[in-house]
Amino acid sequence: MTRLTLALDVMGGDFGPSVTVPAALQALNSNSQLTLLLVGDPDAITPLLAKADFEQRSRLQIIPAQSVIASDARPAQAIRSSRGSSMRVALELVKEGRAQACVSAGNTGALMGLAKLLLKPIEGIERPALVTVLPHQQKGKTVVLDLGANVDCDSTMLVQFAVMGAVLAEEVVGIANPRVALLNIGEEEMKGLGSIRDAAAVLKTLPSLNYIGYLEANELLTGKTDVLVCDGFTGNVTLKTMEGVVRMFLSLLKSQGEGKKRSWWLLLLKRWLQKSLARRFSHLNPDQYNGACLLGLRGSVIKSHGAANQRAFSVAIEQAVQAVQRQIPQRIAARLESLYPAGFELPESDSDVNARQQSGTNGHD
């Protein structure tokens, strides 16, 4: 295995270094070829490394940062005042080639804006999207994007997300001819926002894409599609709702019947069922798939949940390792170039044409 280096914004997230630094040590224990650059306040980081052994310390380096971007900061203001922040320094390490990927649990809007500014999107991609791979009930996986990088998405962005998601599903997840669907409020063609209907009209014209139509949110975990595309607002709400339900379900499995007097054989049966069901649905535990890749950039950036615990943040680090090892940005770019050798120019939807005509322009910006 080739050695690789990741830059961690250890100050980001709800818990900062108290979670991210122990998660970094956990990741080092799991991967002997990994080197981590811990970006943040040395005074906050150093005490948390007291239990690190010599071998771990040899693969750690603290990179000082002067400030932290607040989780509630407005993205535009955060970007303007980002110099010296742990998030920006971590991204700059990737830009300079000192790290191969960045992991942050910080402000999503700021991470999106800074990553786009510093690392640049792949040729032809308008805006990157947050993507994750979710397990479904058929024991397979579904690629879902956008999960919050872009609150408002026009039809062109949705189409680009669909193409990138399909490439990711085929090249990285290993799904041949992946099925692609748009998340909508119904399966009928006339349902949904204009941007969704316009995106559907364009996707139907792409021979390289296996577009299957609309999918409703209650079918997210059924395995009916391999790629599910939506705007960032809808995707974020859908994902967090699903995670909340799964956490509640797993919690109920553990607590069901506590405090009640039962015969010994009923207690044994209850515990057996709890363990059996917990094993059956453990793959749905949100901690096991924490870490969304900012897809569409020339470098690898992983966004962890802000509320991630140690285990979940270590999973996000592993996601970054896989993104580097699988060369996701390079493979996405190469596949797009092979599919669209004349440039990633997609057919315009009716609303895009009307908007361009109303603005008096004759082409794309």
UniProtKB/Swiss-Prot annotation:
Record-linked Pfam families: FA_synthesis
Name by which UniProt lists this protein: Phosphate acyltransferase
Reactions the enzyme catalyzes: a fatty acyl-[ACP] + phosphate = an acyl phosphate + holo-[ACP]
Keywords: Cytoplasm, Lipid biosynthesis, Lipid metabolism, Phospholipid biosynthesis, Phospholipid metabolism, Transferase
Enzyme Commission number(s) of this protein: 2.3.1.274
Species per Swiss-Prot/TrEMBL record: Klebsiella pneumoniae subsp. pneumoniae (strain ATCC 700721 / MGH 78578)
GO biological process, one term: fatty acid biosynthetic process
Protein family per UniProt: Belongs to the PlsX family.
Annotated GO MF terms: phosphate:acyl-[acyl carrier protein] acyltransferase activity
Protein role: Catalyzes the reversible formation of acyl-phosphate (acyl-PO(4)) from acyl-[acyl-carrier-protein] (acyl-ACP). This enzyme utilizes acyl-ACP as fatty acyl donor, but not acyl-CoA.
GO CC terms in record: cytoplasm
Alphabetized Gene3D superfamilies for the sequence: Isopropylmalate Dehydrogenase (3.40.718.10)
